[in-house]
Amino acid sequence: TLLRSAAGQLPLLGGAVEVDGRDAASFQRREFARAVSFMPQIRSVPDIDVYALVCHGRFPHLGLSRHMTAADREAVELAMERTGVAAWRERNLRELSGGERQRVYIAMALCQESGNLLLDEPSAWLDAPRQFELLELLKSLAGQGKTVVLVLHELAQAMAYADKIALLSGGELRAALPPAELFASGL
């Protein structure tokens, strides 16, 4: 619910969301999608091949003709390579396992090339090696200046990879601290 609200998919009950210092409500839809990539925890499984689905991440960058440029195709290829799904380009999404689908949706979010990634349970459905690869990739993107916000229920993953952890309980923010400080606080 928190990430869906931040992504503008649910109305806020209070407060405001800012993206890069600007009120999120002031963005046009495509403009917001160029600034923020959102991957919800629960997604549909359309009857579509992997390449076509990943291409949907380029929507905010396409002009009126909706034709992809060489730069768009390059962004799709890079995202597919980074997530290890390039070999599945012609496979139907419905033929893939849950973990494989998860990687395809992550590729779609990455090829959007926004400065801010909101990912709800991105490591769900992934086996341990793929979880590690994903978290390393996201840490690398954060190191390159992207804002990466994850919902994780695995505290060990959050402690190992997060720069800051927000601890929520009963809909209330209990703390937002670097991992070592959160651990030392005893919360």
What are these regions (language model features)?
Residues G170-G171:
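Conserved ABC ATPase "signature" C-loop
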Residues C55, A70-W88, E113:
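Conserved ABC ATPase "signature" region
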Residues A7:
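Helix-to-loop junction immediately C-terminal to a conserved catalytic motif
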Residues H67, N92-L96:
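Conserved ABC ATPase signature
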Residues L12-D23, F32:
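Conserved ABC transporter NBD signature motif
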Residues D23-S37, S65-T69:
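ABC ATPase NBD coupling module
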Residues L117-E121:
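Catalytic Walker B motif of ABC-type/P-loop ATPase nucleotide-binding domains
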